[in-house]
From Swiss-Prot:
SUPFAM superfamilies: Citrate synthase. The lineage of its organism: Bacteria, Pseudomonadati, Thermosulfidibacterota, Thermosulfidibacteria, Thermosulfidibacterales. It comes from Thermosulfidibacter takaii (strain DSM 17441 / JCM 13301 / NBRC 103674 / ABI70S6). It comes from the Bacteria. The active site is at 274, 320, 375. This is Citrate synthase.
């Protein structure tokens, strides 16, 4: 496989570079670590390495240095499906892994590899899912299905056989190819079992990774294929410090294989503070539609936004921990909606919110970022095309996030980074020594 051959050339170079950095600059500060960091979820603490993506306040996420508009529209546009516009996530995965823009041939090779391996999901995985009550939360089923596949791990087998550390990334790559191929199959199986009468659809060997997920869920429409390609591209990676990405790296640092680490990551993603935002936005938009009997006027929405804020509530889908501009992932989804569903009533409310709410938040004065984030839009797109099972939205998020999590895991195993082991402190210690500690920046 050309991807593996290219990584075999790049990873030894990167490993040497990382070793040199650790040797030369290992005692340099990235920033001051404060008591506030320890009690505040380590928010903003520069203590992890992630080379696949970086989030900038004024540009949003960059995948290996490229912005979303660059990769989606040019000048570095990723390959697309025949007759399509949206980037194929297979191409993004190549970029995340290598740091290089893929050719059409690179993308076709990865896509063909995924399609071939989709046929290899063991029957016992489906048996595990069938043994669970049908009303089990889809994210619980998703995490269980992933973990059930651990029996197939190449990394685990080779580690038991005494695999050299320099070879860890190769086994991680093989597991990642198998898991990424299996995820659409598992996700679609859960969807059909829970919501579509337990009838199931096999993968289509002629479809790409994202389109096959839509197909196996029962949505054979080119616009849905394009939406899934865009969705998987946009939600794929967002640095290494969010709950799902960090969980994946933490568990993986103990030499747990990708099935174990990514299953753990999905349990983090299932938490309401991480993976439920787009559902909350959609419910809020639908509540507005019901309250006003359709699309509200600008004045009605402005008054309702003020009432919401003055009652101490937040407006879902607006604001971001890092961004200080409209999330480029939101802009890409808005562009898709303007092209494919400009007359959708819920989209009209989303557009009106974009016009009204930032100005209200600016006047309110408490929001550091009054602009919409990625979650302000995605639920409405899924709803429009008939995917109306709120609880399943996080599974789609999880399938997408696997692209970034696998790429990060392969790279850190290539760098041969050690197990994570930060030092904890006690509240008693803080009370005893806090007054004597220097203030950050002093």
């Amino acid at each position: 496989m050309k991807l593996k051959e290219r990584l075999a050339e790049l990873i030894p170079q990167w490993r040497a570079e990382v070793a040199e950095i650790r040797k030369k600059y290992g005692n340099r500060k990235t920033m001051d670590c404060t008591i506030g960091h320890a009690y505040g979820g380590m928010r903003g603490l520069k203590a992890l390495v992630c080379d696949t993506s970086e989030v900038f306040p004024d540009e949003g996420v960059k995948f290996r240095g490229y912005t979303i508009p660059e990769l989606r529209e040019g000048p570095h546009k990723l390959p697309t499906a025949e007759g399509g516009f949206e980037p194929l996530p297979e191409g993004l995965w190549y970029l995340l892994l290598t740091g290089e823009l893929p050719t059409e041939e690179d993308v076709k090779e990865i896509s063909a590899e995924f399609t071939k391996r989709m046929q290899n999901v063991p029957q016992y995985v489906f048996d595990v899912l069938r043994a669970m009550p049908v009303d089990t939360h889809p994210m619980t089923m998703f995490a269980a299905g992933i973990l059930a596949m651990q029996r197939e791990s190449v990394f685990a087998k080779r580690y038991e056989e005494g695999m050299r550390r320099e070879e860890h990334w190769e086994a991680m790559l093989e597991d990642s190819l198998n898991m990424l191929a299996a995820l659409p199959v598992i996700a679609a199986y859960i969807y059909r079992r829970k919501y579509k009468g337990d009838t199931h659809i096999a993968p289509d060997p002629n479809l790409d990774w994202s389109a096959n997920l839509a197909h196996m869920m029962g949505f054979d429409d080119f616009e849905v294929y394009e939406l899934f390609r865009l969705y998987m591209f946009l939600h794929s990676d967002h640095e290494g410090g969010n709950v799902s990405a960090h969980t994946n790296l933490l568990v993986n640092s103990a030499y747990s294989d990708i099935y174990r680490s990514f299953s753990a990551a999905m349990n983090g993603l299932a938490g309401p503070l991480h993976g439920l935002a787009n559902q909350e936005v959609l419910r809020w938009i639908q509540m507005l539609y019901k309250k006003f009997g359709g699309v509200p006027t600008k004045e009605q929405l402005e008054r309702f936004a003020w009432d919401t804020l003055n009652s101490g509530q937040v407006i879902p889908g607006y604001g971001h921990a890092v961004l200080r501009v409209t999330d480029p992932r939101y802009v890409a989804q808005r562009d898709f909606a303007l092209k494919h569903l400009p007359d959708d009533e819920l989209f009209k409310i989303v557009s009106l919110c974009y016009e009204v709410i930032p100005e209200v938040l600016k006047k309110h004065g408490k929001a550091k970022n009054p602009w919409p984030n990625v979650d302000a839009h995605s639920g409405v797109l899924l709803w429009h095309y008939g995917i109306r099972e709120y609880d399943f939205y996080t599974v789609l998020f999880g399938v997408s996030r696997a692209l970034g999590c696998t790429a990060q895991a392969i790279l850190v195993r290539g760098y041969m980074l050690p197990i994570e082991r930060p030092k904890s402190i006690t509240t008693r210690w803080v009370k005893e020594v806090a007054e004597s500690l220097p203030v950050a920046g002093s």
